[in-house]
């Protein structure tokens, strides 16, 4: 993962989680006319295949990572530095019923289990994050950013999940002017299984 910018970066930090230096959280600070803007770029651990932290170390690590995410943002909130923040990245959790092709069939599948959804909700509450995508696309509508390589025809089967997210703090909501998931990119030659997610901020 990386953060690329045409604008100068004032500060860049790689935040450590679970005593691992694998660069899963890059924080970048920009100077803007309205004050500092912090962008948090995340790649949350996928969690393996078995949604049981007692027998799956990868899943236990994912839950611990989410706990530390929450603690990190609560610390930012206590320091009163939370005004202009954007969170982006592959969070490897599809929290809503219509963020997956079948909530019933995936409820015990890693990325859509209750324990992950609850942990992500705590992260979101830690800084009053707003899930921008669902301000543009109602929660009652299907919305995906990822389709498995295993599907013979990903577009026809459309068994996707919304694993990639953009959140903003309340102070930035009025500046958000557009949102889009570039679904067609999934059909390019040798594509990623994730489609680009775009946010326009005025």
In which residue ranges do the predicted regions lie?
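Catalytic metal-binding/acid-base residues of hydrolase active sites
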Residues: 43-45, 92-94, 136-138
């Amino acid at each position: 993962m990386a953060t690329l910018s045409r604008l100068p970066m004032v500060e860049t930090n790689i935040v450590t989680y679970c005593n691992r230096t694998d660069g899963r959280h890059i924080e970048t600070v920009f100077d803007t006319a309205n004050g500092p803007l912090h962008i948090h770029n995340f790649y949350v651990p996928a969690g393996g295949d078995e949604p049981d932290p007692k027998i799956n170390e990868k899943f236990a690590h994912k839950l611990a990572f989410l706990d530390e995410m929450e603690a990190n943002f609560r610390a930012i909130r206590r320091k009163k530095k939370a005004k202009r923040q954007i969170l982006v990245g592959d969070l490897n959790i599809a929290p809503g019923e219509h963020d997956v092709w079948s909530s019933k069939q995936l409820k015990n599948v890693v990325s859509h289990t209750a324990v992950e959804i609850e942990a992500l909700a705590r992260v979101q509450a830690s800084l009053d994050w707003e899930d921008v995508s669902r301000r543009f696309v109602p929660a009652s509508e299907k919305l995906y950013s990822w389709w498995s390589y295993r599907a013979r025809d990903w577009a026809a089967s459309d068994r996707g999940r919304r694993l990639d997210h953009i959140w903003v703090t309340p102070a930035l909501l009025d500046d958000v002017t557009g949102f889009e998931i570039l679904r067609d990119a999934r059909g390019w030659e040798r594509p990623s299984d994730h489609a680009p997610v775009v946010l326009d901020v005025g």
